[in-house]
Amino acid sequence: MKLNTIQRKKFRVTGKLKKVASSDRLRLSISRSAKNISAQIIDDVKNITLVSCSSVEKDIRSMDKVNKTEISKIVAEKLAKKAQEKKISKIFFDRGIYKYHGRVKVFAETLRKNGMEF
């Protein structure tokens, strides 16, 4: 089966990160749509999701007059807080098929400000 451009790009980025995965350095996978953004910290050795956060959660969704970039910051802050509660600080940033620009860049910078290392 022939892969399209998006699938090739995803396999190229995520595949490299899965090869170097270890239990001390986890993978942060991010996904975004036109309205929402979500992220999860994954342990590729055990194949489990340790922490996740999304803009569709009730407390974030209920905010009025907040643009998508601000929502991205809020989700990143909440994810960093959840990760610190589970004593996770070192991660690989898996941007997937998305360019490191806009909401993805703001998300990554906010994570760095809140103590995550990648």
From Swiss-Prot:
Coiled coil: none annotated. The keyword Methyltransferase does not apply. Keywords: Ribonucleoprotein, Ribosomal protein, RNA-binding, rRNA-binding. The keyword Ribonucleoprotein applies. One of its GO terms (biological process) is translation. One of its GO terms (molecular function) is structural constituent of ribosome. This is one of the proteins that bind and probably mediate the attachment of the 5S RNA into the large ribosomal subunit, where it forms part of the central protuberance. Part of the 50S ribosomal subunit; part of the 5S rRNA/L5/L18/L25 subcomplex. Contacts the 5S and 23S rRNAs. Belongs to the universal ribosomal protein uL18 family. This is Large ribosomal subunit protein uL18.
